[in-house]
Amino acid sequence: MAKISVIGAGNVGATTVQRLAELEPGEIVMTDIVEGLPQGKALDLMQAGAINGYDTQVTGTNDYADITDSDLVIITAGIARKPGMTREDLMKTNSKIIGEVSRNIAEYAPNSIVINVTNPLDVITYVAMKTTGFETKKVFGMSGVLDAGRFASFIAEELNCSKKDIEAMVIGGHGDLMVPLPQYTTVSGIPLPELLPEETIARLVERTVNGGAEIVGLLKQGSAFYAPSAAIVSVAEAVLKDSKRILPTSAYLEGQYGQEGIYFGVLAKLGANGVEEVLELKLEENQYEILRKSSETIKRGISKLGI
């Protein structure tokens, strides 16, 4: 049985713990700097187990020592972007938070696999890797599974079909410069361009790129957490079960797509060792151009942090 630690007991972190607990993967630790928050949510989740029928031990804590010997650590800590806050402000604030988190992971869970969910995702995942000193394959970010899920949901709505029959593909940076790939997106094996006209696909791609912002606008306060937590658990299961799933992942590049030394959303094989292989797809020229712009944005972010 595995030991899993989730750093951050906000909506994303707590919902992730709930989904994981229902799968009974082993012991789960949820930690947060706010006293009482992880303890209260852990107690609530333990009581839910008596109703939903799971026996997972969930522990809430403010002490990083409790993550000792974790097999998997999921980082959901940090702040969300607030009105008037620039992306650079968000990056600097969250890099400090995740720097502290990562130092504690290195101290107490030096053999763990680390999944980062904190934004700006690709830059912060780089911060986590550099600060822990872990191998690049053992630290990666969750973004593409969420983005692909949003794309698939919009396609299903447009076609009035089951989401179960859609395999959507999104790569690139997590944010405005993500790259949904219609040519690699299928509905029961049928390429999307054979089912929808170009202008409709373009509209769905644009909605996917703005998918997180759409939810923020509707909520007025806070951001998405149901779909993000579902995506996190999908990625976590690939590691815990060593299933070798091929999923969109923010992985460290070593020459793929002409990029090196940054984290970037690509297709990757995930297993017990983390990122076990990065797969490179043939893209259209305009998609390569968006990838280049996205990579430059990530590189500028890393440079500004002076890492």
UniProtKB/Swiss-Prot annotation:
It is an enzyme of class 1 (oxidoreductase). GO terms for biological process: carboxylic acid metabolic process; tricarboxylic acid cycle. It comes from the Archaea. One of its GO terms (molecular function) is L-malate dehydrogenase (NAD+) activity. The keyword Phosphoprotein does not apply. The active site is at H174 (proton acceptor). InterPro entries: L-lactate/malate_DH (IPR001557), Lactate/malate_DH_C (IPR022383), Lactate/malate_DH_N (IPR001236), Lactate_DH/Glyco_Ohase_4_C (IPR015955), Malate_DH_type3 (IPR011275), NAD(P)-bd_dom_sf (IPR036291). Substrate binds at R81, R87, N119, R150. GO terms for cellular component: cytoplasm. Keywords: NAD, Oxidoreductase, Tricarboxylic acid cycle. Signal peptide: none annotated. NAD(+) binds at G8, A9, G10, N11, V12, G13, D32, N94, V117, T118, N119. It catalyses: (S)-malate + NAD(+) = oxaloacetate + NADH + H(+). Its EC number is 1.1.1.37. Catalyzes the reversible oxidation of malate to oxaloacetate. Belongs to the LDH/MDH superfamily. This is Malate dehydrogenase.
